[in-house]
């Protein structure tokens, strides 16, 4: 499991490195290397949908309204949530962190309050809580998938 600051650094690095990834095609500064923004699925100033040329992989990043602070970020593979998920409080501190596999929560998920205190930790297998406490349902990535 990645540490909270590691994910935040990754999201910021994607923004800094993405702009140099491809010079011949329009690339959002928030898209990972090898992906480009899909304007139809992005919402200017609110979120960005990045996808691989073959559309098999995608990354979605949403910002808190009226700010440049990330609200949540997740990756997709073949239309399902796959990989790291992170959500942040409006003040910028990590709120929820976990992993998706085949569109469902797996492994250790954690939740923090706005002051950075851990308030819940749960272990998930195929989307079901098997140990610990349930983690917030902020994970819109469970619902967001390109048709």
What are these regions (language model features)?
Residues 1-6:
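N-terminal secretory signal peptides that target proteins for export/translocation
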């Amino acid at each position: 499991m990645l540490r909270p600051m590691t994910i935040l650094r990754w999201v910021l690095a994607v923004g800094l490195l993405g702009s140099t990834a491809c010079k011949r095609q329009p690339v959002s500064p928030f898209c990972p290397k090898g992906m480009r923004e899909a304007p139809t699925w992005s919402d200017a100033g609110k979120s960005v949908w990045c996808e691989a040329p073959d559309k098999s992989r995608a990354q979605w990043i949403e910002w808190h309204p009226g700010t440049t602070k990330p609200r949540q970020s997740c990756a997709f593979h073949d239309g399902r949530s796959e990989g790291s998920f992170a959500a942040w409080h409006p003040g910028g501190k990590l709120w929820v962190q976990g992993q998706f596999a085949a569109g469902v929560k797996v492994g250790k998920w954690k939740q923090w309050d706005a002051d950075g205190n851990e308030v819940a930790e749960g272990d998930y297998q195929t989307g079901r809580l098997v140990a610990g406490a349930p983690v917030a349902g902020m994970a819109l990535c469970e619902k967001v998938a390109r048709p």
